[in-house]
Amino acid sequence: MPQIYQCDAASIIIENQMFSFNDFKVIASKCEILRLSNVVIMNNDEIIPETEEDQFYFEAAISLETLFQALPNVKTFTYNLPKNSLNIIITKTAEELLKIPHFLSLDLFKISQIPEIFDIEGFYGHIKENKKTKIELDFSRHLSFRYKFRLRTIVAEILETESRDYKLPRIYFSRITRSAHDKMLALHYQN
């Protein structure tokens, strides 16, 4: 990739790419709208793989919270995680995201292909207090029965609550009932 020394773009869409963290910061640190799809940001010390076969070894990928810390101006954040999101989402991702001040002031936070390692319990606490950010969570198809059961319970709690003092999220996962999905979607877009 040619060297970029400055980028003042307010809106950026990146698909099917691998970047060093330094290159990513140059490209995206000033943007307000960022959409990533199948993108891996590698630790600066790692060599970016040359071939597509090498792209499935993401041990050196930086975590979502590290990535997010480099985006102080972002207001709309969408990330369709790569299929092998090893190290991008870790057990402390939800907890660490909530410590980042500009994360709490987002207009939209949408993430897809979320693996089971994501701490939905901790993030659900944030959802119930969130009054600003539209949150859309699409989970991976590869979830345990227990994790899906917890997601169903969270969705049911949200839908059964009559007086909500928070922005209703959109949560999707395989095995969500059609009626729960449709009701959540309708309420989410009314918000």
Over which residues does each language-model region extend?
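The conserved beta-strand core of Leucine-Rich Repeat
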Residues: M1-N191
